[in-house]
Amino acid sequence: MEPYAVVQTGNKQYQVRKGDVIDVELLDGISEENKEVLFQEVLFVFDGEKASVGSPTVGNAVVKGELISFVRGEKVVAYKYKKRKNYHKKIGHRQNYLRVKICDLVM
């Protein structure tokens, strides 16, 4: 089996392998000039032979990624309605994401 890791960012967990492309919530310090993304909250690492489980994180394990683009998610629509009161409210929201390509798993 090929190596993989489980990283946590934006209060969500992602299982990643080298070469994967994932969409994560916006991170501080990332811009068009600074394209390197480091995920330091690595919860689990499998290197092909043995597994390391963190408590809560695996020490000195880092997942390196590269920013591909800024993307926006699908539109989510919330609709409020109260019967017999002539009240309707339509609210839309689109979340901003970073599209990141995983370059390396450092253990």
UniProtKB/Swiss-Prot annotation:
Similarity comment: family membership: Belongs to the bacterial ribosomal protein bL21 family.
SUPFAM superfamilies named in the record: L21p-like (SSF141091)
Species: Chlamydia muridarum (strain MoPn / Nigg)
Gene name of the encoded protein: rplU
Assembly notes: Part of the 50S ribosomal subunit. Contacts protein L20.
Annotated InterPro entries: bL21-like (IPR028909), bL21-like_sf (IPR036164), Ribosomal_bL21 (IPR001787), Ribosomal_bL21_CS (IPR018258)
Name of protein: Large ribosomal subunit protein bL21
Membrane-spanning segments: none
Domain of life: Bacteria
Keywords: Ribonucleoprotein, Ribosomal protein, RNA-binding, rRNA-binding
SS bonds (residue pairs): none
NCBIfam families the UniProt entry points to: L21
GO BP of this protein: translation
